[in-house]
Amino acid sequence: QNPDVVLVKNAGGQTLGYSPASGVKILTDNGLSFKDLNKNGALDPYEDWRLSADLRARDLAERLSIEQIAGLMLYSRHQSIPARADGYFAGTYKGKKFPESGAKPDDLTDQQIVFLSQDNLRHVLLTTVQSPEAAARWNNKVQALCEGLGLGIPANNSTDPRHGTVSTMEYNAGAGGQISMWPGSLGMAASFDPNLVEQFGQIAAAEYRALGIATALSPQVDIATDPRWNRVSGTFGENPKLSAAMSQAYCDGFQTSKGSQEIKNGWGYGSVNAMVKHWPGGGSGEAGRDAHYGMGKFAVYPGGKFATHFIPFTKGAFKLTGKTKMASAIMPYYTISWNQDTKNKENVGNSYNSYIINDLLRKKYKYDGVACTDWSITGNKTQMDNFVGGKPHGVEHLSVAQRHYKVLMAGVDQFGGNNEAAPILEAYKMGMAEHGEWMRARMEQSAVRLLKNIFRVGLFENPYLDVENTKNTVGKPEFMTAGYEAQLKSMVLLKNKNKVLPLKTGKTVYVPKKYTPAGRNFLGAPIPEK
């Protein structure tokens, strides 16, 4: 075990893990042990692991200051371990770039310390990690810091898909590391086997939890209606029913804990929250353009098929066969669902649209999980054809704080890619001026949703990792074998003219040299011809 982490076992109950350096002490009640997370010497309901996640979340939400709730609503920008020296994901260590800082790969950056301790941020998005061991040690340092702050709320770390071999975009930036390798979602769909997808979910969840990751920013269940879209490979294809079946299996695999790992209702130490995306369907961008760019902000639904795009959500992610029942989080896409708002007639990005979130998602389809914006929607856009910058589609005329307020009033709980609490606090003041004390209740509503996803997976009891277990779990041979077998199963023979296949032995095969023209990567940086 890590020398700075103490484990306390409860007979027939939860095992506690805490760092003495955090100041947390152990309380006892009827022979059972509990963590005194707020250090007040009393066992409060949110500290009592015998109670339901819902009751604990409601108790804790009432105790939080508005500043602490605002911190829960933040979801960090992309973090790599260690931080990159330059570029979009850069960070510093005591003011220096990593190569010249003398820091360890698992040390916290200056920026991480600030957003955890000053902005009360508790949801962190990870990309590349130097090694599974470095990720585990980094997680333990993050959790020890969070445990010693305020009410002791642990960090809920997350990732975009990282089990593929290609890392070329912001939304797969963690792929290609020391982890089992599987087909992408489109390859999984080509197997037509939901059981295979559920097996992937179970294995991926085990690897994620060993890395300190408790939320997956996946599955991507957009219907691939335009082959020109550059994100088709991340979907389960063009068939809504197949996508629904795969979405259901994916979420069941990720979220379901079994046996000794289960805490309650299928949730537990083997669970990873699934954030299904992108509501209400992001695969119908005008002319195949993508809404990461200003030139691709519009989603069009020819033929009156808007509701068809809901099927992977309403018949899949919201109707799981497992005990967790539904995906615990959802991400609306950047797009403006053009002329689909039949109530308010607004053409604004989905996270800003009260009809899309409050009326459709919340009321009609009764979804009460976390809704988190896609990354950086509240910032200002700089260039139409550049990935970098905000994506305030349809609300460019509003201030940053007004955008936050509009998102909250639309029914969304969390802001992807936002590290600073100040705009949320400004939005809260706007709500107090317009609605009075109701605004506090609105903030608590989101806090409860966010906290439930942290309680359910056992992070309040033990957020710490055994580094040796991490090294022995992530990318272990049986997981690698399962991924390889899935790759074989995903292959589809499209054509075999003149019976070229199978190849006869002794044949010479010509493989032409690949040329790549000059261009720009997803961040807008130039790529030379090669």
Can you name each region flagged by the protein language model?
Residues 1-530:
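Glycoside hydrolase catalytic-domain context in secreted enzymes
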